[in-house]
Amino acid sequence: MSRVLVDSNVLLDVITEDQRWAQWSSTALERCAEEDVLCINPVIYAEVSIGFERIEDLEAALPTDLVERLPIPYEAAFLAGKCFLDYRRRGGSRKSTLPDFFIGAHAAVQDMQLLTRDAARYRSCFPKLRLITPG
């Protein structure tokens, strides 16, 4: 089984029952889980945690038997920094935060697919990254 890193936007769609994206995200998660191992890292965990008051509630929403938790390799952290620097040099917005670069670099370094709705940024910064996106 291969691994799929699940971006926080997909998890939040389902958790918050987002009117526009919950159905797509839920279906995508189910399809990926049939053949692959769903994974998150500490950055994704932190981004999703914003919607929870208690860690116990977050833990219940992301059970370890359904979602594997992976550390971010130092190689991915280095790549994230370099890609972010390149993005800024190309005129990228200061509003763009480093977490997305950690997520993309982690998937790239460990040769995982990335399940996300934010295709444009990941494609521009990590062109070889295999994405699972809407449409």
Give the location of each predicted region.
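Short loop->beta-strand "edge-of-pocket" segments that line small-molecule binding or catalytic clefts
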Residues: 4, 37-39, 66-71, 113
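Alpha-helix capping/helix-boundary segments
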Residues: 10, 44, 76, 102-103, ...
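Acidic, PIN/NYN-like endoribonuclease modules and their adjacent C-terminal/linker elements
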Residues: 3, 30, 104-135
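Active-site-proximal, substrate-binding regions of enzyme catalytic domains
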Residues: 53-75
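Histidine- and aromatic-rich ligand-binding microenvironments
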Residues: 7, 40-41, 96-97, 118-119, ...
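Active-site neighborhoods of divalent-metal-dependent phosphate/nucleic-acid chemistry enzymes
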Residues: 68-117
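Short, well-structured N-terminal submotif of metal-dependent ribonuclease cores
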Residues: 1-40, 50-61, 132
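Short, flexible loop segments at the rims of nucleotide/cofactor-binding pockets, characterized by
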Residues: 15-18, 47, 90-94
